[in-house]
Amino acid sequence: EPHMTMPRILALGILVIGGCTPVTDTNPPNIVYMLADDLGYGELGSYGQSLIRTPNLDRLAADGMRFTQHYSGSPVCAPSRGTLLTGLSTLRSQIRDNYEVGGYPDPEELGQMPLDSGTYTIGTMLQDAGYVTGAIGKWGLGGRESLGQPRFQGFDYFFGYLDQQLAHNFYPTHLWRNGSRVDLDNEYFSAHQRFEGTDPTDPEQYKRYQGNDYSLDVMADDALRFIEENRDHPFFLYLPFTIPHVALQVPDSSLAQYDGAFEEEPYLGDPTYLPHHRPLSAYAGMITRMDDHIGRILDHLDELGLAENTVVMFASDNGTTYTGGVDAEFFESTAGLRGLKGSLYEGGIRVPLIARWPGHIEAGTESDEVSAFWDMMPTFADIAGVEAPADIDGTSILPALLGEQRNDDRSLYWEYHGLWNGAQAVRVGQWKGVRLGVHEDPHAPIELYDLEADPFETSDIADRYPGVVEQIRAVMDSRTESDHKPWNFASTGEG
């Protein structure tokens, strides 16, 4: 280039000195991992969504790699996050379902079943690698009196909801910063109530379901501050956003972005969560507002000169929900995949994964590498240049990120206890096995689908491939017994 600028010359010099290895010992990359809550496979523009606007995530995909066969750890919140943080699938992980230590409701904020004290998490691993670790958002793996809290599980810093139940309300009275309560400018109201006004079409009668401090906004501001404060050394920032989990609540400015977009009927809070006079616009507005904040985070990385040396990832903890006024059919939220949140069919567990790392991940690429949440721990270890624990279920997807295909035929396993009277699923290569009603019958029949030929799981071909079914049954039967009896099937534990 005839007019090469001094910064460009310097950058080239640094590139030559640094060599072409993905990771240098002197300057390990920052890692920002963003996790949506109940966002379906088809709810981003880059995954085919046409009604909900996600320009910043679409830009992230255009600048990086989009995965088409990535799986969450579970079809519901807590166990999915547990697999992400520990590198263990629900074949043998501690947390295999949502479990409310404090019951419903939970005024003491005892939260969900906690991770054991001393669990080796992604946070612990990256702390050991010299990273400052932060988590901002929804935790769900230990309440305020437990050793499962982030500050005891490898995170130097936490701000957000410890208890998933409180995260049902986007206008909470308070959040938690490490071990301290942080009050917000919101009056208390339950996140589960029916419409009690006189006119369900009157927007004013829904104001009671709003407050002043929208938790997403407060947490996004905190994320910008964390990045700024830790700009001079390697950091890992885990951002488990609460969007678009119900209740349907969003500030008026985001609702207004969808004025006139949809013909919609009010949702009156039946059967659960909160009423909303414009439920389609509220849902779309929530996702777009999250996308706005992601844009702010990406811009902040640019402004601080950190974007080049920061791996940014975005995923979702499970598929779209089936309740609270959400219309997954209207938005084609799963892009045709069968099932929703709580299901082990593809719509419940196949999720978006977008990854950007300038200079390493080729822009505008796509990978059909089969991967899952428990692969993140060894992937982050590779990125940070450290060893992952040997005894985990994950495999690093760094080769896929760098454009090398792996796609081995390892098996991926899920189990879920909250619906279907107990369910298990296994993916091996092109094959997917699903077994329902396992609490009742540990030898329940296994459905078999060929995901290459039948991605929407419409045709059970178990009778045609008995050998594959037996291979899948062996994986299902190899699950370890959980210490929590309700999370066992009669065949492998005390159910």
What are these regions (language model features)?
Residues 495:
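Conserved N-terminal phosphate-binding loop of PLP-dependent enzymes in the Aspartate aminotransferase
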Residues 1-3:
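Short, Lys/Arg-enriched N-terminal segments with co-localized hydrophobic residues
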Residues 20-447, 451-491:
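Formylglycine-dependent sulfatase
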Residues 5-12:
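Sec-dependent signal peptide recognition
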